[in-house]
């Protein structure tokens, strides 16, 4: 969906409220490619769910709270299912903030609240994905509080 498509959606919304799933589908259907319609609609509904439930704010709050509730040596294990979540979690675990910028002390030493337990993200095996197709997008990250 390009910016002109989005502006058309916004203008249409100004004239007619979106009150049902049918209204929403009618509005976005012209922008879905026939071969990618299912994927496009899944992403659109995922975006709606994330926004309506304020999931990114909730994830940020939870991660920030771990700094107070975890004792040194305590482990934080997080499974993410899409790139927005994963980027937040990855940056937070590696740097202690959501932007991914490391804090340094007076001497230039990087200050991070966590140590990554695994250097690489853990993803499901081919066998797991075959048994459970919904696991295909899952990423597991483990960090230990310093």
Where are these regions (language model features)?
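S-adenosyl-L-methionine-dependent methyltransferase catalytic core, i.e., the SAM/SAH-binding region
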Residues: 1-146
